[in-house]
Amino acid sequence: MHLRKAKIKGRIYLSIVQSYRTPDGKTRSKTIETIGYADAFEDIYGDPIAHFEAEVERRNAEARAAEAATIVKFSPARKIDKRAEGRIELGAAVPSAYFHRDLGIWDFFEKRRTARKFAYDPCRILELLAWNRIAEPGSKKAAFESRERFPRKCDFSLDDVYRSLTYLNTHADALVKHMNEHLESVRGPRNKARLYYDVTNYYFEVENEDTDGLRKRGVSKEHRPSPIVQMGLFLDGDGLPFDYEIFAGNANDMTTMLPAMKKAGLRHAGDPEAERIIVVADKGLNTSNNIAAITLDGNGFILSQSVRKAAKQLKDWVLCDEGYRQNGSATFKVKSRIADKAVYVVGEDGKRRKVTVPVKEVAFWSRDYFERSRYEREKVIEKSRAAIRNGGMSSAAAKTSVRYAKDMPAVRETGEAASHNWVLDESKIAADEACDGYYCIIASEQEMDDREIIEAYRGLWRIEDSFRVLKSDFDARPVYVSREDHIRAHFLVCYIALLVMRLMQLDTGRNYTAAQIAQALGGIVGHRLDANAYLFDYRTDLTDELARAVGIDLSRQVLTKGQIRQIMADVRKPLTD
């Protein structure tokens, strides 16, 4: 290998090239690594050319050494060095390949290197944080303390990590846009015909909410009293994360969709060249404002509709047996109709007006959903009975877990109301039971087949699973940072880790869970034999699949430092057939 120095418009462009001979004896060369313009590195290295020439010589020496057998000698008296890290997490090479090749994150920061002189490398810090979120989720401090195990040099301080969070937040929107564009350039157009949207929240282990910030008390999905923040997430039709937005904890779910669509570049009213998309969401997003805006933008929607809370005319139609078509085993039935949905919009004059939007209403009944609803209700009924029996209604009356208890105070002979008299609300139980097993979906796509609409709606499980991965596997909450810019940067890291994880699952045939992949990658740990060699003792069919997907070999039992560095260099290069 040698360092090529090409002069381009007065500047020197550096790359590492390898010479080789063709079968007919001619000498050729191929680019091993593109480095960039020499002057872009002057703030890091005093003499960039001398630095990279030394780097090439070091790689050549390592390549020569790799040809020889690795011989390690141990002394019985040798003791463990408490000061040195004896492990290296080479499993990080796999997500690193997606980080660089598919998402182009290094390219994003490299373009901004000349615009600002960094005392630290924000790309390297982000790469470490994303790996930590996948393999060993914890605080930013914990990620920093694990840096010696990361298979790239991490010459930055803990203060640099926190400084980088501010920088990452500043460029978060541009980075997400860049990742989407780069992913399309590598893998082809994204499946945006349908985009799935949902909202969840994450709690903070603090007592007081922010006076002016994101951490606010709201409706916690985990029923916690702690301050929370809201996260709205879009997935494309293949289940890959497409964009996200962060909202204050007291924001109502239904108010998040339109700002999230705007941020993702999905609101384009009046643009005939814009790509039409169909937004698929749950009943919490089924509001007049959302439907009106989506329709006016020229987009479509598939939204669920609560049967229990539906208008009487719609509820009666859903519960009426007439028109249903059922399968042979009588476990599923469906019907549909074209209707006008009333929505209420506020005009420029501030007045609220009723307008109608033509929709297709699809109602279906499922035995599985019916039995699940009955089972869940029995638990709530029993809790209501227990609360009434134990006299615990004074503090529990507002909770949904005892929603089938009602207060019917007796009336004394004097006509005065007696003390509380809690009883089971049989009429409410009967009304809810009548709706068991029924679903209703409204869609703008009047020509779409009933089954296709139902299957599109059922695709929401992917976004629910994404939130589960973020919360359980990636430990996105509780959040251990407090400044708003750092909180937003934290969720950028989580989002990137989720996107990388979904790409790894896609490339392994979606045969493995996120937890299985994280465990497999976390197991690829080398233990230091001497100053130059590491011993690996973990290999499975899954680790082979993951390594094969990114074109590297992680099956060798002993690797030198040079070979590890070469693997990490290889995953930054485009994968060739």
Q: Predicted regions: what is each one?
A:
Residues 36, 483-504:
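Basic, amphipathic alpha-helical segments enriched in Lys/Arg and hydrophobic/aromatic residues
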Residues 1-212, 225, 232-250, 428, ...:
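Dynamic "connector" segments at or just before major functional cores
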Residues 23-24, 150-156, 188-189, 237-240, ...:
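Secondary-structure transition/capping motifs at alpha-helix termini
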Residues 497-498, 503-531:
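Conserved nucleotidyltransferase catalytic core and NTase-mimicking acidic/glycine-rich helix/loop elements
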Residues 227-229, 246, 300, 305-456, ...:
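An anionic, glycine-rich sequence signature occurring as long contiguous blocks
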Residues 245-268:
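Active-site beta-loop-alpha junctions of metal-dependent nucleic acid enzymes
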Residues 252, 278-289, 307-309, 485-488:
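Acidic, metal-coordinating catalytic cores used for nucleic-acid/nucleotide bond scission
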Residues 453-480:
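Short amphipathic alpha-helical "interface-anchor" segments enriched in bulky aromatics
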